[in-house]
Amino acid sequence: MAGHSKWANIQHRKGRQDAKRGKEFTKAAKEIIIAAKNGGDPSGNPRLRAAIAAAKSINLPKDKIEAAIRKGTGQDSGGDITEIMYEGYGPGGVAVLIEVATDNRNRSVADLRHIMSKNGGSMGESGSVSWMFERKGVFVFEKTAYSEEELMEAALAAGADDLHDEGDTWEIHTSMSDFNTVREAFESDKLIMQSAELAMIPQNMISVDIETAKKVVKLLEALEDYDDVQQVYSNVDIPDEIMNEL
């Protein structure tokens, strides 16, 4: 597994998606606020364009999108949000990256340190694990909607890197610089994407046993449940036979 959808699949199987809908709206709005700091016109701001597309994919209302843009550009208050990437280790020595959007850096780092230590993890210095990951564009498609051949052809034509079988879904990766070009090519081809985002992809995975897997999942869930966290990435590789028992 490529490592991106594996964690999403665990969440789906554990029935966490519906419970997270409210937080997904908050995360999407924060990403728009941060992106809009570099300009409120999506045509000239690729990150904002991607953030709006992601927000629309989860049905964030148009007025919420527009309000977030105004906050990011400084037209309205509420845009004082800082983006930070924290690093650390989880049970079994797995690497953990925590993407945070916060209006209070001191509060966030103190809370994250508590969550990590409470769940068998520890915070690391800047650069301690980030070198194990690469930021890439990630496009996810329903397995039942497209064949491997169809998506491989579309990926090559769009200039994407590779295609991964992630169980219930197909996952296409591309370089960060090509993300918007590839997304626009897929949209032009009328391909329906389950999601399209920039994500930190682990270069190598660490396999764990079932007891460690339970601890890692508990930590990752606790981190994702924290309000200031936008995304959590890990290089944990949980075999399917163990994942089925979680």
UniProtKB/Swiss-Prot annotation:
Keyword DNA-binding in record: yes
A Pfam family per the record: TACO1_YebC_N
One annotated Gene Ontology cellular component of this protein: cytosol
Keyword line: Cytoplasm, DNA-binding, Transcription, Transcription regulation
Highest taxon listed in the record's lineage: Bacteria
Compartments it resides in: Cytoplasm
One GO BP annotation of this record: regulation of DNA-templated transcription
First-listed, main subcellular location of the protein, grouped into a coarse class: cytoplasm
Residue ranges of the region described as Disordered: 1-23
GO molecular function: DNA binding
SUPFAM superfamilies for the chain: YebC-like
Family stated for the protein in its record: Belongs to the TACO1 family.
HAMAP family xrefs: Transcrip_reg_TACO1
This protein's name: Probable transcriptional regulatory protein LI0269
Organism field: Lawsonia intracellularis (strain PHE/MN1-00)
